[in-house]
């Protein structure tokens, strides 16, 4: 098998299976595949990857690209990592949940809500994570434009 044959096969299969819903697919190095998916197709793509043996969701990484927010979903077969990017407009940031495919995504998706202000459709109600329940709900610490605003009864030096 060629050095990147497995990775190229995964990339091609993703493109073939999902057509125009997958873009910017690439193999940048051994054991790594990257692709961007249309937001609405995220759960379907993740279900397909799981069925193909990528049945461990290693983590989810949120991002802020200015006009867009989103997340990378990193799934693995314990050798190769497939990194799926889904983005959403900053003005109305919404991503579909992948909990029906990967129940372990719960804390990762709650983190997208707390830290980036992304609404995750299908996320069940529950406690905030990782921020405390009394943290202001209109502040998103991992957005590039976030500025800490201390509560009225506190200062930054406290």
Predicted regions and their residues:
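Terminal low-complexity/charged segments
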Residues: 1-158
């Amino acid at each position: 098998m060629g050095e990147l044959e497995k990775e190229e096969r995964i990339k091609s299969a993703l493109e073939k299976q999902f057509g125009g819903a997958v873009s910017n697919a690439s193999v940048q190095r051994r054991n790594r595949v990257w692709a961007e998916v249309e937001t609405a197709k995220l759960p379907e793509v993740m279900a397909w990857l799981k069925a193909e043996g990528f049945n461990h969701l290693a983590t989810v990484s949120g991002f802020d690209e200015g006009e867009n927010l989103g997340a990378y979903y990193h799934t693995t077969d314990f050798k190769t990592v497939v990194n799926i990017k889904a983005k959403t407009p900053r003005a109305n940031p919404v991503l579909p949940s992948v909990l029906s495919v990967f129940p372990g995504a719960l804390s990762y998706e709650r983190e997208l809500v707390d830290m980036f202000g992304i609404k995750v459709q299908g996320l069940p109600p529950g406690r905030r994570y990782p921020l405390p329940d009394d943290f202001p709900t209109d502040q998103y610490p991992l957005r590039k434009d976030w500025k800490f605003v201390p509560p009225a009864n506190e200062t930054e030096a406290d």
